[in-house]
C-alpha cells in the first residue's frame, strides 16, 4: 500500500516542478514569485485536500481529527516537494501552518521505514518545542509515534532516560541538545533521516548560530533538511548554504513584512503617563475577548499583571523568568479560556499554538519591524479576523514611523474618547499603588535569582526569552 501512495505522488507532483526548479536558480525573491503565479492558481484549483497533495489516508484522517479542513498555502506548496525527497526552504508568515507542512511528510516517510531518532526538529524556545512535539504525537497517534522534548530548564537525567527509550522524533532547543550529544552516553544522531530548523530567523537572532554549527557537524550528510523562517535574512541565507543540499524555496509571502488581510491594525497616540488608563479602557471595551498584551520587559509584564488583577481582570503573565511549569501553566489557562488576558514579553510572539486570539495590544512597541509582524501575527490566524492596536507614546514616534514604512502603509488611529478614559483615573491610580506593593513583594521573593540574567547566558538559559 505505501508503494501505491508513492506512485500517486509521482503522478501529481510534476506540474509545479519546473517553476520550483527555476526558483532555486533564481537569485532574487522577485524573480521567484512571478513564474509561480499561474502554476499556483492551477495548483489551488486541483490540490484542495491533503490526499491530493499525496498524503496517505491514515494521515489524512489524523488531519481531519485535528480540524485541518484544507491545506494552507505553505502546506500546498511544501508537501508535494517534501514527499519527493527534496530539501526545502519555507518562507511564510506567522500562523500559516508551517508545523504540519514539515510534520506530515516526515511522518509519512517514518511509516515506510520506521526507526528510532528518525527526525530532529530544532526550535528557538521551550514552549514552541513542546507545541511541535504535541503536533507530531497528535498527527501520528494512529502510528504510535513517540516524541521526546529536549529543552533547558528540565532535568538532564530524566531527559537521558527518555532518549534511552529511542523516540522516533526529537524536538529540541540547540543548547540542551548539544549538552546531550556531548555528555549523554550512547546518544547519537548518526542515523538521522530528517532535520527541521523551525523559526530559523529567531534561532539566529537568539545567538544559537555557533551551537547550530556544532550540531550540524555531528549529523549525517545523507539526510533531508527543511528550514522554515518568517523572514530571509543574510544569516538565514548563510545557514541555508551550510545545511541544505540543492534546496527548493517555497514562499507564500509577497512582502518582507506582510500581515494577513483579515488583520485590522491601528494605533493610539497617547502620553506615556496615561498608558495604563488607555489599556484599562480598551480591556473594558473588549471584555470577554481573548487578548494578548505585549510589553518590552519582564518587570513591566509582571507589573501590568498585578495592576489588572487588582482591577478584577483575569490576567496572567508570561515571561522568561517564570519557571517552565509556570509558563506552561499560564499558556494552558489562556488556551482553555479560564483566563482571557495574557501579558507577555516577546516569548509569546512566535510560533506558540494559541488557536484563537481576538485582540493584540502592543502596550510597548517592539524595537523593530519583524518583531511587530510576529506580535500582531498572534491574531487573525487561519482565516479568522483580528485586531491589533499599538500604543505610541511621545518617545515612540520614530520607531512607529519605521514600522509603518516597513509595512508600506499608514495605519489608522484608533478612536478612543479621552473623556471616557479619564473617568477611570481614580480606580486605576489605586490599582497602580497596589501593583507597586505587589511588585515589591514579588522582587523580594525572587531575591538574587534575577541577577543571572545580567551576565552571559549559559546554553541552558538561551532558550528562554529574557524580555
Curated annotation (Swiss-Prot):
Subcellular location: Nucleus
DEAD box, short sequence motif: residues: 198-201
Q motif (motif): residue ranges: 48-76
Keywords: ATP-binding, Helicase, Hydrolase, Nucleotide-binding, Nucleus, Ribosome biogenesis, RNA-binding, rRNA processing
Catalysed transformations (reactions): ATP + H2O = ADP + phosphate + H(+)
Highest taxon above the source species: Eukaryota
MF-aspect GO terms: ATP binding; ATP hydrolysis activity; RNA binding; RNA helicase activity
Keyword Transferase in record: no
GO cellular component terms attached to this protein's record: cytosol; nucleus
Domain Helicase C-terminal positions: 262-422
GO biological process, one term: rRNA processing
Pfam families: DEAD, Helicase_C
InterPro entries, alphabetized: DDX47/Rrp3_DEADc, DEAD/DEAH_box_helicase_dom, DEAD_box_RNA_helicase, Helicase_ATP-bd, Helicase_C-like, P-loop_NTPase, RNA-helicase_DEAD-box_CS, RNA_helicase_DEAD_Q_motif
Region: Disordered, residue numbers: 1-48, 439-467
SUPFAM superfamilies, A to Z: P-loop containing nucleoside triphosphate hydrolases
Binding site for ATP: 92-99
Domain annotation Helicase ATP-binding: ranges: 79-250
EC numbers on record: 3.6.4.13
Domain writeup: The Q motif is unique to and characteristic of the DEAD box family of RNA helicases and controls ATP binding and hydrolysis.
Stated family: Belongs to the DEAD box helicase family. DDX47/RRP3 subfamily.
Protein task: ATP-dependent rRNA helicase required for pre-ribosomal RNA processing. Involved in the maturation of the 35S-pre-rRNA and to its cleavage to mature 18S rRNA.
Protein name: ATP-dependent rRNA helicase rrp3
Protein species of origin: Aspergillus niger (strain ATCC MYA-4892 / CBS 513.88 / FGSC A1513)
Amino acid at each position: 500500500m505505501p508503494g501505491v501512495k508513492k506512485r500517486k505522488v509521482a503522478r501529481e507532483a510534476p506540474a509545479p516542478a519546473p517553476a520550483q526548479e527555476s526558483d532555486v536558480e533564481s537569485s532574487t525573491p522577485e524573480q521567484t514569485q512571478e513564474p509561480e503565479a499561474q502554476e499556483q492558481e492551477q495548483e489551488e484549483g486541483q490540490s484542495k485536500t491533503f490526499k491530493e497533495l499525496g498524503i496517505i489516508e491514515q494521515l489524512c484522517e489524523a488531519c481531519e481529527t485535528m480540524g485541518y479542513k484544507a491545506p494552507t498555502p505553505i502546506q500546498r506548496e511544501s508537501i508535494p516537494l517534501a514527499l519527493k525527497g527534496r530539501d526545502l526552504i519555507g518562507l511564510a508568515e506567522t500562523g500559516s501552518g508551517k508545523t504540519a507542512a514539515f510534520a506530515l511528510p516526515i511522518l509519512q516517510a517514518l511509516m515506510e521505514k520506521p526507526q528510532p531518532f528518525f527526525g530532529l526538529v530544532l526550535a528557538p524556545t521551550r514552549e514552541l518545542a513542546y507545541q511541535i512535539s504535541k503536533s507530531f504525537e497528535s498527527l501520528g497517534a494512529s502510528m504510535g509515534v513517540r516524541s521526546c522534548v529536549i529543552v533547558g530548564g528540565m532535568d538532564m537525567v530524566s531527559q537521558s532516560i527518555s532518549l534511552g527509550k529511542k523516540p522516533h522524533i526529537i524536538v529540541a532547543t540547540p543548547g540542551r541538545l548539544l549538552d546531550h550529544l556531548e555528555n549523554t552516553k550512547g546518544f547519537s544522531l548518526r542515523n538521522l533521516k530528517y532535520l527541521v530548523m523551525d523559526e530559523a530567523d529567531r534561532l539566529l537572532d537568539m545567538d544559537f548560530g555557533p551551537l547550530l554549527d556544532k550540531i550540524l557537524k555531528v549529523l549525517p550528510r545523507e539526510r533531508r533538511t527543511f528550514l522554515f523562517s518568517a523572514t530571509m535574512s543574510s544569516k538565514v541565507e548563510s545557514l541555508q548554504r551550510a545545511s541544505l543540499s540543492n534546496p527548493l524555496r517555497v514562499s507564500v509571502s509577497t512582502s518582507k513584512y506582510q500581515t494577513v488581510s483579515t488583520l485590522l491594525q491601528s494605533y493610539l497616540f497617547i502620553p506615556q503617563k496615561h498608558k495604563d488608563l488607555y489599556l484599562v479602557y480598551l480591556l473594558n471595551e473588549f471584555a470577554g475577548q481573548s487578548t494578548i498584551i505585549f510589553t518590552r520587559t519582564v518587570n513591566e509584564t509582571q507589573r501590568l499583571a498585578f495592576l489588572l488583577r487588582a482591577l478584577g481582570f483575569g490576567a496572567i503573565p508570561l515571561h522568561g523568568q517564570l519557571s517552565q511549569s509556570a509558563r506552561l501553566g499560564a499558556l494552558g489557562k489562556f488556551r482553555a479560556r479560564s483566563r482571557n488576558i495574557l501579558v507577555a514579553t516577546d516569548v509569546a510572539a512566535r510560533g506558540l499554538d494559541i488557536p484563537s486570539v481576538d485582540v493584540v495590544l502592543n502596550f510597548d512597541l517592539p524595537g523593530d519591524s519583524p518583531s511587530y509582524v510576529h506580535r500582531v501575527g498572534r491574531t487573525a490566524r487561519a482565516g479568522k479576523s483580528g485586531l491589533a492596536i499599538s500604543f505610541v507614546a511621545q518617545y515612540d514616534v520614530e520607531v512607529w514611523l519605521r514600522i509603518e514604512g516597513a509595512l508600506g502603509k499608514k495605519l489608522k488611529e484608533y478612536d478612543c474618547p479621552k473623556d471616557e478614559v479619564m473617568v477611570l483615573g481614580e480606580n486605576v491610580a489605586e490599582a497602580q499603588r497596589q501593583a507597586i506593593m505587589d511588585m515589591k513583594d514579588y522582587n523580594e521573593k525572587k531575591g538574587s535569582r534575577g541577577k543571572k540574567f545580567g551576565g552571559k547566558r549559559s546554553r541552558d538559559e538561551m532558550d528562554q526569552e529574557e524580555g
